[in-house]
Structures are given as structure tokens and as C-alpha cells.
């Protein structure tokens, strides 16, 4: 086999192997507390090593405008990622969260802010 063919096969194998290690979140749940101005983010993100496989970046958007970028350096739980983000949103606003894994892969979720309950 020529050197070029060996090199191409090696690169393709390396790319295929690295794609197998990506571990994006498998689900994201969002809830917004309008009284507190707090967005609660909870994602299922299994991790084999909390310091190597974790949610490394969260981008938050309100009505398509990026309002927050948060960086993380480890995950605190082997199965879930959680965080609370302070932001202002009104009923009808669309909040989008995009989570990125340290090993590659991403997942996004949107929610529409509802009217606050009156307690009746």
C-alpha cells in the first residue's frame, strides 16, 4: 500500500474513533421562575470521568439574542448537569439553551415563558 493510502486510512480511523467518544447531553429540561428571574437548567449527561467528560459550555438566548455564556471545568454528578442562570424574561419570550460537551457534541432545548401563576 502506498504511504498516502496508509495515511488516509489512519486519519479516517482516528476521526471515526474520536466521533465515538463524543457524549452530548441526552435530554435538557428548562424551567423559568419569573418571580426570581431564574432559569433552571437540568440535563442528562452521563460522564465516565467528571473532570474529562462534562458540560463545558452553556449558551443562553432570549428571543434569539444571546444573553449569557457560561464555561465549566468539571461536572458535579455522573449523570446530570444542573445550573441556575439569572435572566429577565417576560411571558411569551422564547428561551433557548445550547449545551456543549467537553468531548464534543451538543444539544439545544427551547421553552416559551408562560404567565406566572396567581396562586388561585
Question: What is the role of each PLM region?
Answer:
Residues 16-17:
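N-terminal signal peptide c-region/cleavage motif recognized by signal peptidases
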Residues 1-8:
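Bacterial N-terminal signal peptides that target proteins for export
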Residues 41-43, 80-88:
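Exposed aromatic-hydrophobic patches
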Residues 57-61, 98:
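Beta-strand signatures of extracellular beta-sandwich domains
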Residues 65-76, 112-114:
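Solvent-exposed serine/threonine-rich low-complexity stretches and specific carbohydrate-binding patches
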Residues 99-109:
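Short acidic/polar inter-strand loop motif in beta-rich domains
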Amino acid at each position: 500500500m502506498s504511504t498516502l493510502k496508509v495515511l488516509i486510512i489512519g486519519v479516517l480511523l482516528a476521526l471515526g474513533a474520536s466521533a465515538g467518544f463524543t457524549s452530548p447531553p441526552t435530554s435538557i429540561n428548562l424551567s423559568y421562575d419569573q418571580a426570581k428571574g431564574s432559569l433552571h437548567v437540568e440535563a442528562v449527561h452521563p460522564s465516565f470521568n467528571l473532570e474529562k467528560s462534562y458540560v463545558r459550555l452553556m449558551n443562553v438566548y432570549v428571543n434569539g439574542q444571546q444573553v449569557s455564556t457560561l464555561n465549566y471545568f468539571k461536572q458535579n454528578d455522573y449523570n446530570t448537569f444542573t445550573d441556575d442562570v439569572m435572566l429577565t424574561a417576560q411571558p411569551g419570550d422564547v428561551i433557548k439553551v445550547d449545551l456543549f460537551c467537553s468531548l464534543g457534541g451538543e444539544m439545544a432545548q427551547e421553552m416559551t415563558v408562560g404567565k406566572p401563576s396567581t396562586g388561585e
